[in-house]
């Protein structure tokens, strides 16, 4: 599926505008491996609060449109999640 088709499908999703905005932003900035970005940085980039960003990311995950993979440093510290569009 090409990007234009994904944008068109996004318009018809039964989700809030914030979720559509996140999906389109990730579509623009991510590659096949996805993108590693913090919820805070993602929200700041698109103008949403951290809580709204987090809720909408989980909505997209439950709709099976997004994979969320946790990342850890070598010493076990928590890093930002990796988001990959399906």
Name these PLM-found stretches:
Residues 54-86:
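Winged-helix/helix-turn-helix nucleic-acid-interaction surface
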Residues 1-45, 51, 65, 76-80:
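Short recognition helix of helix-turn-helix/winged-helix DNA-binding domains
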């Amino acid at each position: 599926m090409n990007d234009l088709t994904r944008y068109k499908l996004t318009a018809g999703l039964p989700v809030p505008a914030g979720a559509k905005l996140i999906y389109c932003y990730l579509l623009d900035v991510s590659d096949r491996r996805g993108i590693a970005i913090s919820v805070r940085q993602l929200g700041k980039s698109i103008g949403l609060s951290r809580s709204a960003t987090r809720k909408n990311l989980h909505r997209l995950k439950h709709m099976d449109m997004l994979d969320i993979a946790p990342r850890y440093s070598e010493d076990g510290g928590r890093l930002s999640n990796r988001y990959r569009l399906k």
